[in-house]
Every structure is written in C-alpha cells, then in structure tokens.
C-alpha cells in the first residue's frame, strides 16, 4: 500500500495520463483483493493476482522514472528520447527498416557495377539505417504487440545480414538495461535459438545480463518462468 501511495505521488509529476489510468486500475484491484481477504474468501488465484499487481507496479514505476528523467537528465539516452523525431523519419518503423536492410546486399552488388560513388552512397545509407534502427530500438522502453511481431521478423528473415541482426540484439539488450520489458526478454530467448552462432551467443550474453539485473522480478512472470524452466542451458 505504501508503495502505491509513493507511486501515486510520483505520477503527479508525470504528464503521462495512461500511466495514471493504469495506476488507478491497479489500486482498485488491490482494494478488491484486500476486501476479499478480510471477508475470508478462499481465492485460489490470490497469489497470481498479487504477483501481477507487483509486476504492474514495477512497470509503472519504471515508465514514470524514465519520463521524469527525460526532462532532467543530460545522459545521451534521455537526450535522444526527448528530441522530437523529424517528420521525414516518422514512417521508418522497424518493418520498414528491416526491408531496407534486407536489400543492402543486392543494392551493394548493383552499385558495384556502376561506380565507386554509387557504392559509397549505398554504404552510407546502410550505415545511417543501422544507426537509426539502433537508436530507435535502444530508446523504446516498451514494445507494442506490432513491434514485437516486427522484431520476430528480424529473426526469421533470410535476407537480413547477420551483423545487422547482431547489432539489433545489442540494441534490445541495452534497451532492457534501461527499462524492463517482458516482450523484449521473451524475444531475446527466441534470439538465443537463432541458427547463426554469433547471433545466438550475443542473445545469450544479453539474457544473462538482464536476468542478473532483474533477478528479483523474474519470478513475477509465470510465462517467463515456464520458458526458462525449459531451457537447461541458462
């Protein structure tokens, strides 16, 4: 209860109304749970409800902390997050970036037949695409279901250069170091199974770091616990 009160106080300084709404819903669920306990109700799902309440509280606190630091911190991470994205880049979703990266090898081969200048243009465009993909992924605190699906396409693509995939894995790992996101953790576990050994090992290193950082929170997520139980290597 004290944690919820402190979080409510923190959110008064936060401009995100969605987070406030989530907190209000969480507080309501917590009150109902306490009332059922006072009535002596035998609820077999009580422990699961409690774990979800704690997990949601952590996540709201994470998002609130980031939003407040975005307005105050001089760290490059927060500078990138608070800098408005140019309108010309608004259409560059992860799916769009994937298509651009997939065409790199063909574009490079064609440009090599034309001129060194054309080849330099392709190389520069590829470098800029990677930079934008990295920054966008690193500073994204929570994937939407659509973004998670696009990230899965990165793993299944047969045209994406492995080095580009490895950079994306690093960006996901660094993003998780800034803010917990269950979707990204589950994705890293998928990436660990990638057939390319370099991609798989990079994902494994990321998983180990993330599991250490959030070791006190992992048990709150049943799906994650079940997933890890099936992986003897970790």
Can you annotate each of these PLM segments?
Residues 42-46, 206-208, 225-226:
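Short, Lys/Arg-enriched charge-dense amphipathic segments
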Residues 1-110, 125:
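Extended, helix-rich scaffolding/adaptor regions
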Residues 9-12, 28-35, 59, 63-66, ...:
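Positions within ordered alpha-helical repeat solenoids
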Residues 3, 19, 200, 220-221:
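Solenoid-repeat scaffolds in large eukaryotic assemblies
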Residues 24-31, 148, 182-189, 225-228:
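Hydrophobic core segments within long, regular secondary-structure runs in both alpha-
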Residues 92, 96-194, 199-200, 206, ...:
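Alpha-helical solenoid scaffolds in large eukaryotic transport, assembly, and signaling factors
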Residues 220-234:
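Eukaryote-biased recognition of long, low-complexity, charge-rich segments
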């Amino acid at each position: 209860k004290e944690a919820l009160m402190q979080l409510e106080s923190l959110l008064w300084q936060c401009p995100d109304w969605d987070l406030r709404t989530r907190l209000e819903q969480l507080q309501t669920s917590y009150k109902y749970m306490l009332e059922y306990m006072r009535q002596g109700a035998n609820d077999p799902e009580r422990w699961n409800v409690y774990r979800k309440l704690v997990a949601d509280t952590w996540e709201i606190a994470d998002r609130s902390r980031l939003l407040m630091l975005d307005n105050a911190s001089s760290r490059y991470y927060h500078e990138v997050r608070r800098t408005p994205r140019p309108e010309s880049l608004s259409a560059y979703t992860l799916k769009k970036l994937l298509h651009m990266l997939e065409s790199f090898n063909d574009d490079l081969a064609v440009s090599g037949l034309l001129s060194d200048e054309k080849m330099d243009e392709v190389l520069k465009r590829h470098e800029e695409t990677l930079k934008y993909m990295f920054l966008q992924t690193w500073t994204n605190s929570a994937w939407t279901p659509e973004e998670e699906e696009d990230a899965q396409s990165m793993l299944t693509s047969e045209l994406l250069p492995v080095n580009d995939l490895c950079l994306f894995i690093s960006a996901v790992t660094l993003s998780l170091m800034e803010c917990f996101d269950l979707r990204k953790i589950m994705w890293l576990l998928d990436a660990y199974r990638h057939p390319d050994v370099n991609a798989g090992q990079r994902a494994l290193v990321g998983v180990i770091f993330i599991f250490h950082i959030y070791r006190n929170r992992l048990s709150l997520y049943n799906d994650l616990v079940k997933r890890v139980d099936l992986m003897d290597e970790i």
